[in-house]
Regions:
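Hydrophobic alpha-helical connector segments
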Residues: 57, 71-100, 151-154
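Hydrophobic alpha-helical segments that form the core
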Residues: 146-165, 176-183
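Short, structured helix-loop boundary elements
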Residues: 9-10, 30, 52, 56, ...
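N-terminal intrinsically disordered/low-complexity leader segments
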Residues: 1-7, 189-192
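Amphipathic alpha-helical segments used for helix-helix packing
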Residues: 83, 98-118
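Amphipathic alpha-helical packing segments from all-alpha helical-bundle domains
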Residues: 64-67, 83-86, 116-141, 152, ...
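Alpha-helical DNA-contacting segments of helix-turn-helix folds
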Residues: 55-62, 69
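Helix-turn-helix
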Residues: 11, 15-53, 57
């Protein structure tokens, strides 16, 4: 079966994304990705010039999918920014179920790629920045006195939920995230 270059690129990225997430980026070689995708390493390198390019595409895809999922949850919650914030955490609770969660893809990427000059590192930081900025937008819509402070607090809960789910499971400390978010939101009263 012949594929277009775009189809081959998507196939390689699909396989690489699965392997990178479940087995680790550095632990997954290009030869393994090519074999599982049913392409030669030369074909893989035509789609992605280097493994670093493939990793950057994996991070970009993960970021795009997450942002779309969280934006959809916010939109479904309606115009109330408080409901939007809670919807983001409800979506996160779905994402950290053990059958689909090994850990935060961006945090795992940052652990494996600490060099700030690498596109994968920059993409992972960008994803984390987006979450904080999204919380900032919603906090601003709430009309609280210090939306940046609320955004930071929500980001800390977000990251804590991700990391404790990875270490202790979704039924451990992450099960308290929504209650903690509700308490934080109750503490930050609108200034208007």
């Amino acid at each position: 079966m012949r594929r277009t270059a775009a189809e081959t690129r998507e196939l390689v990225l699909d396989v690489a994304s699965r392997l990178f997430y479940w087995q680790g980026i550095r632990a997954t070689g290009v030869d393994k990705i090519a074999a599982e995708a049913g392409v030669s390493p030369n074909v893989l390198y035509r789609a992605f010039a280097t493994k670093d390019d493939l990793v950057a595409a994996y991070v970009a895809r993960s970021r795009e999918q997450s942002q779309a999922r969280f934006d959809t949850a916010i939109a479904a919650a309606g115009p109330d920014p408080r409901a939007g914030i809670l919807a983001m955490f409800d979506a996160l609770a779905e994402d950290i179920r053990p059958e689909v969660f090994r850990g935060c893809a961006c945090m795992m990427t940052l652990a494996e790629f600490p060099d700030e000059a690498l596109p994968a590192h920059q993409g992972a930081v960008g994803a984390k920045t987006w979450v904080r900025e999204r919380f900032g937008e919603l906090a601003g819509q709430l009309g609280v006195a210090e939306p940046e402070v609320l955004a930071d607090q929500l980001s800390i809960i977000w990251e804590g939920t991700n990391s404790t789910a990875q270490a202790m499971g979704a039924d451990g400390p992450p099960a308290s995230a929504r209650a903690l978010v509700t308490a934080i939101l109750d503490h930050h009263k609108p200034s208007r």
